Structures are given as structure tokens and as C-alpha cells.
């Protein structure tokens, strides 16, 4: 009987290998198991998400059956014009161009489904392309403008964008060539969807036509609106170094401010400076452009010598008459008669020769506040003599009532308020009163008024207070009312 033999060496090595694997498994399993679980979980969630999104889109299509071209792209802001080559194409107020995916049935942004995150492409079409009709894909293809032979692509920059919840932003795009060589001499921008979607057609968006100029022309472009300190050739129909520009420079009209100032001072003379080469239509275009200039709110007040006291003209930074200050009342320009407007314009011309006598305010409100609330003892406000003004005429502005309210709040009776004013201007009005009444055939008021004035002045010089103080002011107010009536009669306003 033969005794079997065993290769204990090989079996021992097998046992060692098994033990080694068990050891590796013991150490690696705690590390690998969480990692594998995480990877599997992410893949499952991703697949499940795609599956659910597809189910949602199918449900939406079943609930709201989609028709051909049921969605459309639309530019959400206008292009900023003019457009120059190599310059960034911008929307209103320098913003990036924004495109929205619109549901025409609601007019709202379509922000659900795969189409709301589709890829967009910007392209160029002919300026005479009919963007009103319901164009076809073939119409678009036939009107796309390509670059000229040997030139760079017509659009430079990132011509692709992606919708985010139905809105896309087209940024950093510029033209490399002008539009003068095309059949319409204009371009339109278009945007279309690059991706294709089942059962869905999306209409392209097309802008209005516009001219693309060479960037060298940007140095000579007009400003809309112009600035007061822009050179005058920035106005429409006035070319740089052209005939109109030279004529204006010879008359020392160098800026838009100069142009507007001369227009308000003497429009017919300004028209003569430009000459017959500027037609009436061109003149209106230039003038409308100049008038679109944004002016500051400052106002300027001036009382010209030789005019009635208590009368001053109010004008703005370009010498336009805003109104008159007459007898402590502000009369806006639209309420002035033609004669008063002519007088006001003469006063403005005189003011420009006496700028040191012009008083400026931030706006009309601050002007009225300074004029109406100025202390009576000043005798003069904004260069206007108000020394003879009766306080009753201020009641319409709430001045007297506020004065009494102030006295009451401070614990004083209104009779105790010091309202001492020396009515110098009153004598001047009185001196002219007899002549006025005599010419008009009115009864001579001299004796009665003289008596009232003498009584007032005698009380003024005496040390009288309280009710007597109020009584003599009442008399003065009555006299002032008489003077107002006779003054209005003299001016023919009654």
C-alpha cells in the first residue's frame, strides 16, 4: 500500500495569500464602501432627475398641446444708437443686450422646460428685411449678411449665449465692418435658437434696422442729448469745420450754451448768422436738438436801472426769461404780455453786461423763499427795492399769518411783535399819485392821504406801543391799499 504524499509548501503559500487578501479587505472595505455608495447615489440621482424632467415635459405637452412656433424670442431692450465698428453693441443706458423667450399666449417669459435653457446665436440680416410678416426659415437664410471677401467675420466676440430661465444676455459683441456696402446700407441683428426641440418651434427675434458707421466717425458723432459745454458742431446739421460751424465761430458762438443763449436773446440774428444755406427744416432740426440739452435748475435775478423799482427779471443759465418779479409777486413767462416779455428780454441783455449785479439761486423755490422771507428791514431783496412794501401784500403768501403764529408760539401778543418798517417807497408812490388821478379825472386824494401819513408819522415818532402800535399800522395798510388801487389804474389793469 502506497502512502500519499502532500506538497505542504504550495498549500501553505495559498493559505498565506488568502490571509493577505482578508487583511487587505479588512482595511480597504471601510474606505471603499462609502466612496462607492456616494458615486452610485450621484449617478442614480442624475439619471432619475433626467427621467423626471422628461416626464414633466411630456406631461406639460399633454396638458398644453404645443403648436408650431408657439414660442418666440424677443429683444427686451433697444439698441443704443449710433453703432460704430469695433465698439461694443449696447442696449439702452449702456446695458447689455437682453433676449427673452416669450409665450405669445400670455406675453410672459417662458421659464420652464428644456427650451428655457436653450443655446442662442446672434446673426446679422439685411436692413430691408421684412420683420413684420411671418417669415420662414428660408427667408432668414436668404437675408443673412456675411462678411465681405477677405474680411474678418462680421460680428466679433461671443455670438453665442445660453438662456437662463428664459432670459439670455448678449455681451461683448461688436461689428468689424460698416453697413455702407450692403444693398440697404443698414443692418439688423437677429437671435435664434441653436438647439432643436420636438414639437416646439421658436420664432427668431429681429431688431429694427440701423446704420453701422466706421469707428473713425465716432470722433464726430452728435450727442443725444447735447451738453451745454459741447462744441456747437455737436448739434445736428452743423458739421465740424463746415460752413455753419465757421459762421458761428466768427460770431463767437462756440458751444451749445452760446447757441441757446443767442437764440433766446435774438433768434432772428442767430438765424442770419447761419445764412440762407440752412433751410427752415434744417433750422428746426438743429434747434430741437439744442433744446433737448438738459439745463440745471439755477435761476438768476437782476433789476435793471431805468426800470420801475420793485421789478426784476428772472432768467436761466441760457438767458431764457423765466418770469418777472413785480411788486413782490412772481409772474411766470407764460403769463407775461408781449410788451412785458420784450421788456424782460431787454433786462436780460443788460444783466449780461452787469453780471456782478446778478443774484443767483439754486432754483425757483429757493429764490421765492429768499425773496418772500427776507426781513423787511433789509429794504432790498435780490437787488429789488421793497422798502415801501406794505405787509398786507404778503398775506397771500402766508407771511403775515406765519408772523403772528410765531409770536403766539413764543408767548407774545401779535401787537408786541416789532414790525417797524420805514416806508421810504411809499412817498415815491404818493408823489406820483396826484398826477395819475388828475390825468384819469379821479378825485384828488391828496388831503386825505396826507392826513393819514402825517398821523402815521406823528405816532411813529412818539413812544407808543400795544394797541396804538397796531392802530397806526392799520392806517398804513389802508394807505397802501389806496396806493395799490391807484397804481393799477395808472397801469391800466383796472
Curated annotation (Swiss-Prot):
Instruction: List the Pfam families hit by this protein, alphabetically.
Output: Calmod_bind_C (PF20452), Calmod_bind_M (PF20451), Calmodulin_bind (PF07887)
Q: Does the keyword Ligase apply?
A: no
Q: Keywords in UniProt for this one?
A: Activator, Calmodulin-binding, DNA-binding, Nucleus, Transcription, Transcription regulation
Say which family it is in. Answer: Belongs to the plant ACBP60 protein family.
Question: Which GO biological process entries does UniProt record here?
Answer: negative regulation of defense response to bacterium
Q: Where is this region: Calmodulin-binding?
A: 1-62
Q: Could you give the subunit structure recorded for this chain?
A: Interacts with calmodulin (CaM).
> What gene does this protein come from?
CBP60A
Its lineage reads: Eukaryota, Viridiplantae, Streptophyta, Embryophyta, Tracheophyta
Full protein name: Calmodulin-binding protein 60 A
Q: What does this protein do?
A: Transcription activator that binds DNA in a sequence-specific manner, likely 5'-GAAATTTTGG-3', to promote the expression of target genes.
Provide the free-text tissue specificity comment from this protein's UniProt record.
Expressed in stems, flowers and root.
| InterPro entries the record matches | Calmod_bind_C (IPR046829), Calmod_bind_M (IPR046830), Calmodulin_bind_N (IPR046831), CBP60 (IPR012416)
PANTHER family registered for this protein in UniProt: CALMODULIN-BINDING PROTEIN 60 A (PTHR31713:SF14), OS02G0177800 PROTEIN (PTHR31713)
Q: Where is this region: DNA-binding?
A: 132-252
Location in the cell reads:
Nucleus
Q: Does the UniProt entry include the keyword Kinase?
A: no
